[in-house]
Each structure stands twice: as C-alpha cells, then as structure tokens.
Amino acid sequence: MLEDVIKELREGIEKAIEALRRDLAKVRTGRANAAMLDGIRVDYYGVPTPIVQMATVSVPEPRLISVKPWEKNQVKAIEKAIRESDLGLNPQVDADLIRLPIPPLTEERRREMVKLTKKNGEDCKVAIRKHRRDANEMIDSLEKDGDVSGDEADRAKKKVDDVVAEGTKLVDTVIAGKEKDILDV
C-alpha cells in the first residue's frame, strides 16, 4: 500500500518535470530549435493545425530553422502564422521553403526569458508540492484506517520528503541548464 503511494508520487513528479522540459523547449535561447514552433497553429482548411503536422521542420544551421510545407499552397498560411506569433521571427519564403533566421537575443530579452524560465520552474515545484500533499494525505488516511502503523506512516512520510527533495533538485538542475543556454551569447 505504502509502496503504491510512493510509486504514484514518483510518477506525478516525473510528469511534472516532463511538462517543464516541454515548456522550456519552446523558450527561445538564441539558438535554433524546432520545438520553438510547437505552439504555432496554422489555419488549415478552417482547422487550427500545428506546423509539424503540415510541414517538415529542420534545423540545418545553429541559427536557422527551415520549414518545408508538404502542400505548396500552404506556404503563405504558414508564413503568416509564424509572422503573427509572439516569437519575433521574420520568415523568408524561397519558393516552397520557409527559412527562419534566429536573431541573437538582446540583453533585455534574455532577462525576460530567464524570468519566464524561473516562473516555469516555480510552477513545476508547486505541482511537486501538491503531489507531496496528496501522498501525505493518503498515508494519513491509511494510518487512520488502521492499515499501517504510526511508525510505518512516519517512515513513509520521510520517504515522501526524500522523493520530493530529489524532484525539486532535478527541477533546479533543469532550470539552471536552461538559464545557462539563454545567457550564453
């Protein structure tokens, strides 16, 4: 029973950290990253569609993303969606290929990106604390129902705290790595 609580806690923390990594992949660092385009939707015959479902997205150079639509008639729609996104990119159309040069980030923009990164990290830590609270409540209810002894419950709570500390440390490592990427010129 207690093993299930700990297992569920670990899974919840892993999901929170995976969500953090996905969110951070979309944050601009000054280097080209195909995941930057994940949040952009293109109007495809009246349906908002992710670019990756309409085109091949590649990173041929460190500061260039290339987008090759599978249907040539969608080039203008994809260009418009990229231009209107809040990424600050200026698409260059070359026949049926869209090139996205990634401009270097200004110092001010880098600071904004670091703030956003820290906010994402803090949100992840809040989610981890919520998982800890849920696990502790489950342990308390098992103890109250008489399914586990007080000593077992105390050991399980200690284990919960250790798992949470491990998860929080991993979040700090992920955030520090992303901040380093952003601040590297």
From Swiss-Prot:
Coiled-coil region list: none
Domain of life: Bacteria
GO MF entries: ribosomal large subunit binding
Pfam families named among the record's database cross-references: RRF (PF01765)
GO cellular component, one term: cytoplasm
GO biological process: translational termination
UniProtKB keywords: Cytoplasm, Protein biosynthesis
Bias-annotated ranges (Basic and acidic residues): 141-159
CDD domains, A to Z: RRF
Region of interest: Disordered: 139-159
Membrane-crossing residue ranges in chain numbering: none
Compartments reported by the entry: Cytoplasm
Family of this protein: Belongs to the RRF family.
Main function: Responsible for the release of ribosomes from messenger RNA at the termination of protein biosynthesis. May increase the efficiency of translation by recycling ribosomes from one round of translation to another.
Name of the protein in question: Ribosome-recycling factor
Phylogenetic classification of the source organism: Bacteria, Pseudomonadati, Myxococcota, Polyangia, Polyangiales
